[in-house]
UniProtKB/Swiss-Prot annotation:
It is found in: Cytoplasm. Pfam families: EFP (PF01132), EFP_N (PF08207), Elong-fact-P_C (PF09285). GO terms for cellular component: cytoplasm. Belongs to the elongation factor P family. GO terms for molecular function: translation elongation factor activity. GO terms for biological process: peptide biosynthetic process. This is Elongation factor P. It comes from Desulfatibacillum aliphaticivorans. It comes from the Bacteria. Its main location: cytoplasm. Pathway: Protein biosynthesis; polypeptide chain elongation. The lineage of its organism: Bacteria, Pseudomonadati, Thermodesulfobacteriota, Desulfobacteria, Desulfobacterales.
Length: 187
């Protein structure tokens, strides 16, 4: 069982028989009364949001989710296809289930696919991915007017703020948790 004090972002638990993932957990200690946790979570089956408050003594059942290592294959319309790296079985996820992770999906990227009752319901990206810069404005050395970052377009279509020395064709590392530039990748 999970105690309310152990709730953190990305904690997966069962509420009313359905799996949820915590998006935000805020500890509130009012001047009078009992302290509580204000929680915002997403239903992993339907994608709907739920906001609830819980007391410190409340307990929860951990979500019975299975994670399988899979590889991204391709997208067709709003369907995304993945392959199990051990059995070569393929699964399909909708654009809704993939969510913002679609900004990081490149061919052959390995990640964990979440399964609930043998049904694929979501993905867990690796913390860092390497993406190629496909469009970047040129940088003039000594140009301090432009500031310390510039927008570039990555191979997935994502637009990201990067340091001015990053050029078109450069491979960069991006943190999938924050969506921020990390470093250039030397190949």
């Amino acid at each position: 069982m999970i105690n309310a004090g152990e709730l953190r972002k990305n904690t997966k638990l069962m509420i009313e028989g359905e799996p949820y993932v915590m998006l935000e957990v805020q500890f509130v200690k009012p001047g009078k009364g009992v302290a509580f946790y204000k929680c915002k979570m997403r239903n992993l089956m339907t994608g709907s949001l739920l906001e609830r408050t819980y007391r410190s003594g409340d307990t929860f059942e951990p979500a019975a989710l299975e994670e399988k290592k899979m590889q991204y294959l391709y997208a067709q319309g709003d369907e995304y296809y993945f392959m199990d790296v051990k059995t070569y079985d393929q699964v399909m996820l909708t654009e809704e289930a993939v969510g913002d992770a679609k900004e990081y999906l490149i061919d052959n990227l390995e990640m964990d696919i979440l399964f609930f009752e043998n049904k694929a319901i979501g993905i867990t990206l690796p913390n860092f991915v390497e993406l190629e810069v496909t469009q970047a404005d040129p940088w003039v050395k000594g140009d301090s007017v432009a500031g310390d970052s510039k927008p570039v377009t990555l191979q997935t279509g994502m637009v990201l703020q990067v340091p001015p020395f990053v050029e078109e064709g450069t491979i960069i590392q991006v943190d999938t948790r924050t969506g921020a530039y990390v470093t250039r990748v030397k190949k």
